Amino acid sequence: MTDKKPEEKVDDKEKAEFIEKENALLKEINELRTNPKAYAEKIEKNKKYFDDKNVYRHPEDQAGVRTKEGAEAYDEAIDFLKNKAVPVEALVRSKGLNKLAFDILSEYQKNVDAEIDLDGLMGKYGKFAGAFREVCQFGSYRPEQIIINLVVSDGDKTRGQRDALFEAGLKQAGVAFGKHDIYKFLTVITGSAKYENTVDADDTA
């Protein structure tokens, strides 16, 4: 078990930058959900950044990332988006789901191996009904790359995070982006079929 780490602090400039990224992330998610065939083109354009050792080196990233499946996982994701994915409706931002995403992010900032008590957190800012999904992505800084990574789900043959992004029953979402002591950055996305914000969510979001 990893020792708990103090939460990373951000200044006002970073906070504004992170909010911008969160907005961009939701935009990317909705592009993916509503037009998967077009999103496949983004992944195709990025496939060229693999070397012959399964290392992904994007020119805008500080360092390369060694992957488990290499470009083959990109090919599989492209095929899925072009030939199998069914477009689903865009997600609407929820204040309560946003707060929930930040609570989860805060737990992972303190302990990367944290066992999140979702049952305890889910009712903190509102009332849930129907489907619920939560996905995390460690390390990436650029919104497009974050969503590509979730779609590709390198090393996870179940592609569970991809399935979560395409959950047809989801209607609302929350997005949190922040620093991480080990992986530099962390993204948490929460989605629900129906979520009714409580007063606390409206006051604190």
For every predicted segment, state its role.
Residues 5, 16, 61, 68, ...:
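Short, well-ordered helical secondary-structure segments
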Residues 10-111:
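A short alpha-helix/helix-coil micro-patch that ends at or immediately precedes a cysteine
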